[in-house]
Amino acid sequence: MKKAGIIMIIGSLLLLSLFKFPLWNIMLGAPQYPDPLGMNIHIDGIKGVSEFDLTNIDGLNHYIGMKVIPKPADMWEFSVFPKVIGGMAALGVLIGLLGFLEKVSYKWFIGWFILMTVLGVLGMYDFNQWLTAYGSDLDPHAIIKVVNPDGTPMSYKPPLLGYQKMLNFDVTSLPHTGGYLMFVGMSLTIVAFFVGKKETKHI
């Protein structure tokens, strides 16, 4: 299973791209902002797309009662996620190496993929919970208050994935480079599984 082991190792190593590239991106465009405001979500913190984007977003949020964008120290996820990604990358490389040496079955490759998928789903759920709290837990004394037709306060929760019109802002939430590379890496581990299965049949 040499070929399958190598593919598994490459796929696992692509997770390390998350230490350099953002996982996710949220952009806010409006007529008064010719250059959209944006924030890149990394596994260890949130950064502005441009130098002053986070400051400007926090300024807008203040008027409608939203909290400031959290610092890494404010969220436990930003200290745990790097450890999870590093651990899963190391585990994947180890499984790939053992597969290369024919010490483990190709089924370990799909086992790693399933575990990574579960962790990914949990991560997206946690991210969505944060977006909900971020957009809904508003200061009752905010300068600007917007309500729904039924009289309840309007939520400013950004979409988890895709586009949403929010007041006069066009909000887009999509994976960034690190997210796409992680997807490619996970896809390669599925390829490794089928290649390993094929190689085993030829023995």
Task: Describe each PLM feature range.
Residues 172-199:
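A hydrophobic membrane-anchoring alpha-helix module
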Residues 20-79, 128-173:
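Long, glycine/tryptophan/cysteine-rich extracytoplasmic
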Residues 100, 104-141, 162-164:
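Mature, soluble, non-transmembrane domains
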Residues 3, 74-80, 101-108, 167-177:
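Membrane-interfacial loop-to-transmembrane-helix junctions in polytopic alpha-helical membrane proteins
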Residues 9-11, 18, 77-98, 110-121, ...:
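Hydrophobic alpha-helical transmembrane segments
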Residues 19-26, 93, 97-100, 124-134, ...:
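Transmembrane helix-loop junctions and nearby membrane-interface residues
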Residues 1-15, 103-116, 195:
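Alpha-helical transmembrane segments and their helix-start/interface "positive-inside/aromatic belt" motifs
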